[in-house]
Amino acid sequence: MGQTLFDKVWKKHVLHGKEGEPQLLYIDLHLIHEVTSPQAFEGLRIQNRKLRRPDLTFATLDHNVPTIDIFNIKDEIANKQITTLQQNAKDFGVHIFDMGSDEQGIVHMVGPETGLTQPGKTIVCGDSHTATHGAFGAIAFGIGTSEVEHVFATQTLWQTKPKNLKININGSLPAGVYAKDIILYLINQYGVDFGTGYALEFTGETIKNLSMEARMTICNMAIEAGAKYGLMQPDETTFNYVKGRPYATDFDSSMAWWKELYSDDDAYFDKVIELDVTNLEPQVTWGTNPEMGVSFSNPFPEIKNANDQRAYDYMGLHPGQKAEDIKLGYVFLGSCTNARLSDLIEASHIIKGQQVHPNITAIVVPGSRTVKKEAEALGLDKLFKDAGFEWREPGCSMCLGMNPDQVPEGVHCASTSNRNFEGRQGKGARTHLVSPAMAAAAAINGKFIDVRKVVV
């Protein structure tokens, strides 16, 4: 019996434990940020422990950082978390991509951009969207603060191996339909828990034809499908992305191992899902979890249970309405899901020569300083600002109500982020998840439109 991609990487990292029982995994890369690391560092101090592998631990500042005046942090808790990480990095010898540094940004942007994220690695971070790195053929997953401390102390974690679920995606994406629409559609069709207990391997011709940035968008939202892990087979697209990046110093010697990272033809999957994207439409969420979404041409569904009723009440919507009926007030282009250069380029095609609708506050937050510099080199900052968008500094920003960037209560926001929970973008904020192109078109038109009609 052959092995899946996930099985191969898992097996290589098992230090102790039997099949079917919790196993001790070696961790190749530990990414940290200011929110989930302070207590873990304090635990080391209390027990007088050293950091086991500071050379495999990298820090960035993202969740709490302001995106307007980055060195003027008014919130006391946010400021404390940021300064604490800066001091902890100094005390324990951790490399930090600090405020204002050339590489600072959202943790799931920084890893790939610097070449830290590589095929075949085990990667952890105290953040639920760590599966983003699985797009490179890595086992990457989010962990809690107690686990962060365990990795600090031992560079290992006890984990129970999940089952394997293959999502085979084929067909050519229509113009105006993107990777974000693929993952939103899957979650809408199969629910927010269909991946629970599984490692999701995304495969098929559609995946092979996607850029690395688009692949990361899909893996980023594996957790919204209930899965701890989401990954893809590394190929020439992957290798070309990694090659030449600062931390990819063992590129040539690693290729032999990387080229073995695929699921064997006779590998067993516990479950298989088939998807043809040929007729896929742009997706829009209407409710308060990512499962509550529709294809653009479809009306919002009938109320089936108390959760639906609560969602409609919170969102101020009702069954039978369509996405174009939503009265938008904010548009947010950003987050670890869709704040990469290709996302901003796609959005720029939509808004070029246009003006943001007078009823809309539109914000662009590049996911990292690297993306910001590259976008500005292309003149995208001027294009967005000329259209009426705010052009901000890198950070998690409006993805979560943990920093100054928040959506006002009761206001509907077209967002390229990954979660539309109650209060996610601020108290009473009403979030609608969409692709960057859909968000850009909404900013110009003041409402959702079928972006397939305007995509360039």
Curated annotation (Swiss-Prot):
Q: Identify the metabolic or biological route this protein is part of.
A: Amino-acid biosynthesis; L-leucine biosynthesis; L-leucine from 3-methyl-2-oxobutanoate: step 2/4
Q: Which reaction does it catalyse?
A: (2R,3S)-3-isopropylmalate = (2S)-2-isopropylmalate
**Signal peptide range:** none
What does the record's cofactor remark say about binding? Answer: Binds 1 [4Fe-4S] cluster per subunit.
Q: Record keywords: RNA-binding included?
A: no
Query: Which domain of life, per UniProt?
Result: Bacteria
Name the positions where [4Fe-4S] cluster binds: C336, C396, C399
Q: Give the GO molecular function terms.
A: 3-isopropylmalate dehydratase activity; 4 iron, 4 sulfur cluster binding; metal ion binding
One Pfam family here: Aconitase
HAMAP family (alphabetical): LeuC_type1
What binding partners and quaternary form does the record give?
Answer: Heterodimer of LeuC and LeuD.
- Give the similarity note: Belongs to the aconitase/IPM isomerase family. LeuC type 1 subfamily.
Q: What is this protein called?
A: 3-isopropylmalate dehydratase large subunit
Q: Which gene encodes it?
A: leuC
